[in-house]
A protein has these predicted regions:
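PLP-dependent class I/II
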Residues: 1-193
Length: 193
């Protein structure tokens, strides 16, 4: 990807919004590239609160002024109180400690969700990690979503595919998929398809 960007004089935007919730993985593209052709974007709303719309980016020096201008033109102001509160959290190690607690709770939620899913005959397409997982339910998840619409909302795999092809996979949020009633409803809906 980096070679293509270089060859076509393009920049890559690496959106890493869930960085604080993701397990350690391969190096970021921006790190491999030393910010020559990449713009790294992340934020704090997923780990702290959605109301704190404060993010950050790292970019090639040649792009920084244009990115600042774009930010100023598109948002006019920045919530100073939120920025100050976030700076306090960063300076005093509060974000790190908070992140550790959130990750512990997420691990417990993930474990409960995996047990529930597997006890209802589902399997994970990839090892469960981070905030989201891919569950194979064995039936077309778009049809399943329609069957469950009155009780629960699910995220069919087709929504996450460029060609919107049918899929037996659904994306689950481990933090919100721990209710046994959800998995029982999924069983009933599958049986009715």
């Amino acid at each position: 990807m980096l070679q293509l960007a270089q060859g076509h004089d393009l920049h890559i935007v690496e959106d890493d919004t869930y960085a604080h919730l993701a397990p350690a993985h391969l190096p970021r593209i921006a790190a491999l590239d030393a910010l020559e052709r990449t713009v790294y974007v992340s934020g704090f709303s997923k780990i702290l609160t959605p109301a704190w719309r404060v993010g950050y980016l790292a970019a090639p020096a040649a792009l920084v002024d244009r990115l600042i201008d774009t930010k100023l033109l598109s948002t006019l102001t920045t919530p100073a109180l939120t920025e100050q509160a976030l700076a306090h959290c960063l300076e005093h190690g509060l974000l790190r400690r908070h992140t550790e607690r959130v990750l512990q709770r997420l691990e417990a939620a993930r474990s409960r969700t995996v047990k529930l899913a597997e006890s209802h005959g589902c399997r994970f397409a990839t090892p469960p990690r981070g905030l989201f997982g891919w569950v194979d339910v064995g039936v077309d998840t778009e049809r399943l979503a329609q069957a469950m619409l009155d009780e629960w909302l699910i995220a069919p795999g087709a929504l996450f595919h460029a060609t919107h092809r049918p899929s037996t996979l659904m994306r689950v949020n481990f933090a919100t998929s721990q209710d046994a009633a959800f998995w029982r409803a999924l069983d009933r809906a599958r049986a009715g398809l």
